[in-house]
Swiss-Prot record:
The active site is at 537, 631, 812. This is T7 RNA polymerase. SMART domains: RPOL_N (SM01311). Monomer. Interacts with T7 lysozyme; this interaction inhibits transcriptional function of T7 RNA polymerase.
């Protein structure tokens, strides 16, 4: 076994950086200066340890080829080996006589697949196994190539069936053994139906498999020198063998790159001093530059980042600096509770991942004799394993968040650096941050409080009701909920481990934090200094922005832009319309029918039951369609989702969890049920927010025209190349949407994953614009850029007009301390109105791209969507627009 040793990085330059230390010491004292730089140093060490752990795990599992450290090596070697395989094929064909055994098996397989399997399998054997004899490695290569040939024919010969029925399920299996076992079952089923030409696979003989592997190793050596052969115990009976080793220069190349990657993979942490202000496109947030200085904008390349270097956007810089200057601290009371209950076997908070795996279902006594019982047990066990995989990942994340909270628990204040994605959405940089899940948000509170006062106490109670899920009713009813549950709240604050009513609420940890503050007001009165962040959340933010920019009164009313005595719940509105259709279909819908299906390849005719809308409606009525069924689909409409996307969401969010929990037994045909519901949601939401759908279609038309290549019809001369889409947000942030087709070609293997092959000839051309992605991405990216601009404008407005210093920000959620909540409530609305009164963002977008169109395209561009009669000033009077 080859050992790949990664040299440890020396990050001492971070902790010992003199310039940031002196700056920090002058402002915050030497102790905090040392601690801050030590934390930044530690972040790099933590990141390195995480990378090394992953690398070592991949080494042991034989998956080192999947690590980024090995991929450049493989990318370099692949073309060389592919060329050698092609040459060998030609050499063999040119010769007379009997052809080599290996050729007979390899000639029907793509050289790219043979080369990749050889390199990946060889690396796996040499870095994970002790038995690295030529025979052992050759046998492994031969078996892997046979598996690709055998099961790859399902993908290639029955592409439609594979894509529709097999691929997704195959990808859910983890590990070669389980993937192969699954494909064997699929193969048997397909053969029984006359697919694959009705021919069963004739397994390769062991000697033939080794012949194939040996020839592949020979070609690997001939073309790349990646490995070398060594004779062991020559002449010793029973011990004479030939081993294979990774060439030292290649082992060193992997180790060197792994070390470099480990050095630029920091696990960023909070700061114990205010973050470094942003003054340029790099170097803000953290005080020492480290190996990888933080970038203001998260882009896919340095070239993309450099576009922002000379952009004048003072309001953007100002907003990010105000946001990250917010002082936070750990909520010790919530932390004390979280430290205990997350270790309980039966945690009262439903969303907390358990410490131990759920027990497998009991095996039926007749499982060995009853195939149906075996199948049912396997299905139930598979659900447990699937849930456990997610549980492990979530548990690791939970324990890291708790570790971070405990680490910073005794600091009077901590801060979180912020930056943006390329659309301008604002993100906290560290892994532990205020934009996390309910527990993470509950563990944090703002560091600077003020006496709560009467108005602040009012908003505190509104916040408490929101955390309990009582947020779809008017404010008086929310207040009433809190007052009626006064005893419960006080009991939870006094003994949260004994009185766990708080754990039953919609956002349990945030509600627990509220309970403690509510009790504080009860004990100390309105002079109580409260620093709990109270959040005002948008009501389906994407549709709010589309409705505002188009003055759409119908859509605006559905998402609470207009004053109303009751809360408009667009998810509930759509669910109601869906239920009306379900009721009608249950009575007058279509009946089930038996449809005949003709196999395109074999001509075999089979029958299957297609559920009618009457049966499907009955299933959904039995399950119960509420806002939770429609929420994700409606929410993602403004971000580009359509009927097909809705189908997958319904399947993943509703049907599959219901089946796993035993509550979805009515869904006898999950895919049909999901498709039916997706269609109803699409129809219902399309008539609810007509203008938003129209705006999205208009944006797609614009992006499609820009991404089109214009040629002279007679000469074929290119008159205009494909263009990226560019626009500027109302606060001056430039957005470039530029999806490109990868220069590489993707190689898909059945069990060894995917790999992108570099072209063998470098054309020195930039890759082309991906027209499909440009079109499908424009609506979500455009509206995300608008809500990012609104957030930044709100931060600056609230800070400069109302003197607010503390902000809790999550895209369309705006929070601050109770004493300042009323002013932030106003600021969010004022900036929304100001933005769309002073900017016609769609007209501005048109102006920014129209000049790039060729004259022949101008008549293809549809007119700007018509505007409605929504009075933007009404937003100022709407209680529930952001509430």
């Amino acid at each position: 076994m080859n050992t790949i040793n990664i040299a440890k990085n020396d990050f001492s330059d971070i902790e010992l950086a003199a310039i940031p230390f002196n700056t920090l010491a002058d402002h915050y004292g030497e102790r905090l200066a040392r601690e801050q730089l030590a934390l930044e140093h530690e972040s790099y060490e933590m990141g390195e340890a995480r990378f090394r752990k992953m690398f070592e795990r991949q080494l042991k599992a034989g998956e080192v080829a999947d690590n980024a450290a090995a991929k450049p090596l493989i990318t370099t070697l692949l073309p060389k080996m592919i060329a050698r395989i092609n040459d060998w094929f030609e050499e063999v064909k040119a010769k007379r006589g009997k052809r080599p055994t290996a050729f007979q098996f390899l000639q029907e397989i793509k050289p790219e697949a043979v080369a990749y399997i050889t390199i990946k399998t060889t690396l796996a054997c040499l870095t994970s196994a002790d038995n690295t004899t030529v025979q052992a490695v050759a046998s492994a290569i031969g078996r892997a190539i046979e598996d690709e040939a055998r099961f790859g024919r399902i993908r290639d010969l029955e592409a439609k069936h594979f894509k529709k029925n097999v691929e997704e399920q195959l990808n859910k299996r983890v590990g070669h053994v389980y993937k192969k076992a699954f494909m064997q079952v699929v193969e048997a089923d397909m053969l029984s139906k006359g697919l694959l030409g009705g021919e069963a696979w004739s397994s390769w003989h062991k000697e033939d498999s080794i012949h194939v592997g040996v020839r592949c190793i020979e070609m690997l050596i001939e073309s790349t020198g990646m490995v070398s052969l060594h004779r062991q115990n020559a002449g010793v009976v029973g011990q004479d063998s030939e081993t294979i080793e990774l060439a030292p220069e290649y082992a060193e190349a992997i180790a060197t790159r792994a070390g470099a990657l480990a050095g630029i993979s920091p696990m960023f942490q909070p700061c114990v001093v205010p973050p470094k202000p942003w003054t340029g496109i790099t170097g803000g947030g953290y005080w020492a530059n480290g190996r990888r200085p933080l970038a203001l904008v998260r882009t896919h390349s340095k070239k993309a980042l450099m576009r922002y270097e000379d952009v004048y956007m003072p309001e953007v810089y100002k907003a990010i600096n105000i946001a990250q200057n917010t002082a936070w601290k750990i909520n010790k009371k919530v932390l004390a509770v979280a430290n205990v209950i997350t270790k309980w076997k039966h945690c009262p908070v439903e969303d907390i991942p358990a410490i131990e795996r759920e027990e497998l279902p009991m095996k039926p006594e007749d499982i060995d004799m009853n195939p149906e019982a075996l199948t049912a047990w396997k299905r139930a066990a598979a659900a447990v394993y699937r849930k456990d995989k997610a549980r492990k990942s979530r548990r690791i994340s939970l324990e890291f968040m708790l570790e971070q909270a405990n680490k910073f628990a005794n600091h009077k204040a901590i801060w979180f650096p912020y930056n943006m994605d390329w659309r301008g959405r604002v993100y906290a940089v560290s892994m532990f941050n205020p934009q996390g899940n309910d527990m993470t948000k509950g563990l944090l509170t703002l560091a600077k409080g003020k006496p709560i006062g009467k108005e602040g106490y009012y908003w505190l109670k509104i916040h408490g009701a929101n955390c309990a899920g009582v947020d779809k009713v008017p404010f008086p009813e929310r207040i009433k909920f809190i007052e009626e549950n006064h005893e419960n709240i006080m009991a939870c604050a006094k003994s949260p481990l004994e009185n766990t009513w708080w754990a039953e609420q919609d956002s349990p940890f945030c509600f627990l934090a509220f309970c403690f503050e509510y009790a504080g007001v009860q004990h100390h009165g309105l002079s109580y200094n409260c620093s709990l962040p109270l959040a005002f959340d948008g009501s389906c933010s994407g549709i709010q922005h589309f409705s505002a920019m188009l003055r759409d009164e119908v859509g605006g009313r559905a998402v609470n832009l207009l004053p109303s005595e009751t809360v408009q719940d667009i998810y509930g509105i759509v669910a109601k319309k869906v239920n009306e259709i379900l009721q009608a279909d249950a009575i007058n819908g279509t009946d089930n029918e038996v449809v005949t299906v003709t196999d395109e390849n074999t001509g075999e005719i089979s029958e299957k039951v297609k559920l009618g809308t009457k049966a499907l409606a009955g299933q959904w009525l039995a399950y119960g369609v509420t806002r939770s069924v429609t929420k994700r689909s409606v929410m993602t409409l403004a971000y580009g989702s359509k009927e097909f996307g809705f189908r997958q969401q319904v399947l993943e969010d509703t049907i599959q969890p219901a089946i796993d929990s035993g509550k979805g037994l009515m869904f006898t045909q999950p895919n049909q049920a999901a498709g039916y519901m997706a269609k109803l949601i699409w129809e219902s939401v399309s008539v609810t927010v007509v203008a938003a759908v129209e705006a999205m279609n208009w944006l797609k038309s614009a992006a499609k025209l820009l991404a089109a290549e214009v040629k002279d019809k007679k000469t074929g001369e290119i008159l205009r190349k494909r263009c990226a889409v560019h626009w500027v947000t109302p606060d001056g942030f430039p957005v470039w949407q530029e999806y490109k087709k990868p220069i590489q070609t993707r190689l898909n293997l059945m069990f060894l994953g995917q790999f992108r092959l570099q072209p063998t000839i470098n054309t020195n051309k930039d890759s082309e614009i991906d027209a499909h992605k440009q079109e499908s991405g424009i609506a979500p990216n455009f509206v995300h850029s608008q809500d990012g601009s609104h957030l930044r404008k709100t931060v600056v407005w609230a800070h400069e007009k109302y003197g607010i210093e503390s902000f809790a920000l999550i895209h369309d959620s705006f929070g601050t301390i109770p004493a300042d909540a009323a002013n932030l409530f106003k600021a969010v609305r004022e900036t929304m109105v100001d933005t769309y009164e002073s900017c016609d963002v769609l007209a501005d977008f048109y102006d920014q791209f129209a000049d790039q169109l060729h004259e022949s395209q101008l008549d293809k561009m549809p007119a700007l969507p018509a505007k409605g009669n929504l009075n933007l000033r009404d937003i100022l009077e709407s209680d529930f627009a952001f509430a």
